[in-house]
């Protein structure tokens, strides 16, 4: 009954596989399966053209063209509501009557350039911005992973409030959770997760491990590019996101550390918090909405070795603070980043978009109400 109801909404799921967006894709494809969505992976469309445009310094155009091709495939397959990630793939989406877009993102191109130290869009910039404004005028709903991102959308593109929706990403708190009977190791276990070691500040973590004061502390480096180091460095190169081995390792650790130099809303910080780990992290992008400074961890203004060394020492010397902030981290995720909360918001937005492209008949209204109610019962029964 639930599946039949939600299949009446012809949903296209068009997703990006860059960095943490692979995790968004994987979880959505599983947790939105009741819609039987038409699934399209952006990188499968116009891959060669995207690589050519990137080679000649027009990476943003390549991403937009690939997004357009994937969205076109979804429309040709009958999709009326297209859930698309990310904003960088959305500017050239086909704006057809009877089709509505929902675009999920974590930063604008301006934030991307400023936060990640890249170049601005240059000559195509005004055209790309104009296309995003056309998307806005077409009725697109913009899902925002953080308030930081939503504020930028409002300021840069004057998007009205009724087309903006805060939607923090989620973790399954039944999978990502503290160990029930955690064995306390005499050696504290510190966790770092990051694919791009330089951008994520791994050099600072390696330097911390070399300090004599931390010789009895174990540092776990989860990255396909993790390198060997002193004996208390433990590289984990083969762990994949959402794998049981990664969940197990995370729940076995005591503290999460991420001296990131450029970020938006890192999912690893959410997963660590769900497992009851406080964090020492740099306040980039929307991170302050994930880690509450002084409550669920410590948010530092810059990626400086001295600052991270001092904070790590403070946590290791104060077991009550370490445990207390870990409990608060778990509670913060339960309240703000649970699968139930994320899905209830997302189903409501999808239903709203579906209504906007169909005749406002009683049948459609009943379908939408039934879809929301059925989904709420399903998600609530899962927690």
Write out the residue ranges for each language-model feature.
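A charged, aromatic-enriched C-terminal amphipathic alpha-helix characteristic of glycosyltransferases
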Residues: 61, 320-351, 355-357, 363
């Amino acid at each position: 009954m639930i599946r039949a109801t939600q299949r009446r909404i012809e949903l296209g799921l068009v997703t990006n596989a860059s960095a943490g967006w692979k995790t968004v894709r994987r979880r959505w494809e599983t947790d939105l399966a009741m819609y039987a969505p038409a699934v399209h992976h952006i990188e499968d469309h116009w891959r060669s053209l995207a690589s050519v445009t990137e080679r000649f310094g027009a990476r943003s155009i390549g991403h937009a063209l690939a997004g357009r091709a994937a969205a076109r495939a979804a429309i040709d397959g009958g999709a009326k509501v297209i859930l698309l990630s990310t904003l960088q793939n959305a500017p050239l989406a086909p704006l057809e009557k009877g089709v509505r877009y929902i675009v999920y993102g974590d930063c604008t191109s301006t934030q991307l350039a400023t936060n990640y130290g890249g170049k601005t869009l240059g000559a195509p910039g005004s055209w790309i911005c104009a296309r995003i404004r056309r998307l806005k005028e077409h009725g697109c709903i913009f899902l925002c992973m953080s308030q930081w991102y939503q504020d930028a959308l409002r300021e840069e593109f004057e998007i009205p409030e009724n087309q903006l929706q805060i939607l923090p990403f989620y973790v399954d708190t039944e999978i990502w959770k503290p160990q029930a009977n955690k064995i306390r190791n005499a050696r504290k276990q510190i966790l770092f997760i990051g694919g791009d070691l330089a951008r994520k500040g791994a050099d600072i973590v390696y330097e911390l491990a070399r300090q004599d004061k931390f010789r009895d502390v174990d540092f776990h480096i989860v990255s396909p590019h993790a390198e060997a180091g002193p004996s208390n460095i433990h590289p984990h190169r083969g762990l994949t996101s959402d794998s049981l081995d990664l969940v197990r390792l995370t729940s076995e650790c005591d503290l999460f550390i991420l001296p990131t130099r450029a970020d938006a809303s890192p999912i690893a910080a959410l997963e660590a918090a769900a497992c009851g780990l406080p964090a020492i992290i740099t306040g980039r992008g929307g991170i302050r909405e994930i880690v509450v400074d002084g409550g669920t961890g410590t948010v530092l203004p810059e990626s400086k070795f001295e600052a991270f060394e001092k904070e790590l020492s403070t946590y290791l010397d104060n077991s009550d603070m370490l445990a207390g902030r870990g409990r608060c981290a778990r509670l913060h995720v339960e309240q703000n980043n649970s699968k139930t909360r994320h899905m209830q918001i997302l189903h409501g937005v999808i239903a709203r978009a579906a209504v906007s492209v169909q005749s406002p008949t009683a049948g459609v209204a009943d379908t939408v109400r039934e879809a929301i109610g059925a989904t709420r019962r399903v998600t609530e029964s899962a927690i």
